[in-house]
Design a protein with these regions (language model features):
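Residues within well-ordered alpha-helices
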Residues: 8-12, 59, 83, 160
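Short secondary-structure boundary/capping segments
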Residues: 13, 34, 63, 85, ...
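Phosphate/diphosphate ligand-binding glycine-rich loop within oxidoreductases
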Residues: 41-125, 140, 144
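Short, structured coil segments at secondary-structure junctions
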Residues: 15-17, 90, 168
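Rossmann-like dinucleotide/phosphate-binding beta-alpha-beta segment
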Residues: 136-171
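N-terminal glycine-/charge-rich "phosphate-binding" loop or analogous flexible N-terminal tail
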Residues: 1-51
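Short gly/ser/thr-rich secondary-structure transition/capping motifs
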Residues: 22-28, 52-55, 128-136
Length: 171
């Protein structure tokens, strides 16, 4: 649904001519999506519950409508949109795409922390709109030696903690 994580996946599958790949969008009418889903062997969806309409969450009801389905894959590490027990019962394999972008996400989180702490966006906007801006209003905070709170210490959370500790001697 909606996007490929990377175009190489579609390119490789198209090269084999062994697959009929159908790209669906969640805003398409169900008269277009369900005929494709009902005959599919594989189904790739987002992993965040709030990004996928409920009728496309893979659960027992969904699997009854898609009896040929043998594999479900989610974007990212999670599989909140997939009922693992229902898939097991139906014989459908579940896979996710964990870890591929973990370093990039951890670095992005660190960049956001720096941007917020140093008031970079606010200062940039003021500087562009007002030639007489007072830079003292945008001094920000140093990160060195501070205590950081991280919610969740999975792969990404642990990497953020490592970066904070190594780069800024944060606790």
């Amino acid at each position: 649904f909606n996007r490929w994580q990377h175009s190489i996946g579609q390119e490789l599958l198209n090269e084999t001519n062994a697959f009929d790949i159908r790209f669906l969008k969640t805003d398409m009418p169900e008269t277009k999506t369900w005929p494709a889903i009902e005959t599919s062997l594989g189904f790739q969806i987002g992993s965040a519950r709030d990004e996928l309409p409920l009728q496309y969450h893979v659960n027992a009801k969904f699997l009854k409508r898609a009896p040929k389905l043998i594999a479900v894959c989610t974007h990212g590490a999670g599989y909140d949109t997939v009922d693992a027990a229902a898939c097991t019962e139906a014989g459908a394999l579940i896979c996710n795409q964990t870890g591929k972008n973990g370093e990039a996400v951890a670095e992005h989180a660190l960049g956001m922390m720096l941007s917020l702490g140093k008031k970079i966006l606010e200062a940039d906007r003021r500087m562009r709109s007002d030639r007489e801006w007072d830079r003292n209003q945008f001094m920000g905070q140093d990160m060195l030696g501070k205590t950081v709170g991280i919610v969740g210490l999975g792969n990404i959370g642990r990497r953020v903690a490592e970066l904070c500790s190594q780069l800024f001697r944060m606790r």
